[in-house]
């Protein structure tokens, strides 16, 4: 049994398989998941698990080079945006339109669906390297 890090076997496997610049998405319960992209559905009820809880655990276990967010989060979910900025200090933040964000999700290795039910609580994490 693992003692530290991500315990969910699907998430742990995806993180272990990421190469430099590969992406994963952590999403609220409303983000459409494109056909062909692996869905890891953690949602058990509205709000559980939260987007921020899942982001924290994944970010602690992943080398992140860049973070992509929908620019709409700035005005429509300032609290989530602020928390992302606080939790992910090192990587560069990139904002794109929500439509562009959804296009980018088509290239993700996986989308982790949370129970979050607040607008634009979605993030694309771009894998970095540990050296």
Curated annotation (Swiss-Prot):
Keywords carried by this UniProt record: Carbohydrate metabolism, Cytoplasm, Isomerase
Subunit structure: Homodecamer.
Family as reported in the entry's similarity comment: Belongs to the RbsD / FucU family. RbsD subfamily.
Bilayer-spanning residue ranges: none
Protein name listed in UniProt: D-ribose pyranase
Active site positions, chain numbering: 20
Gene3D superfamilies: RbsD-like domain
GO biological process, one term: D-ribose catabolic process
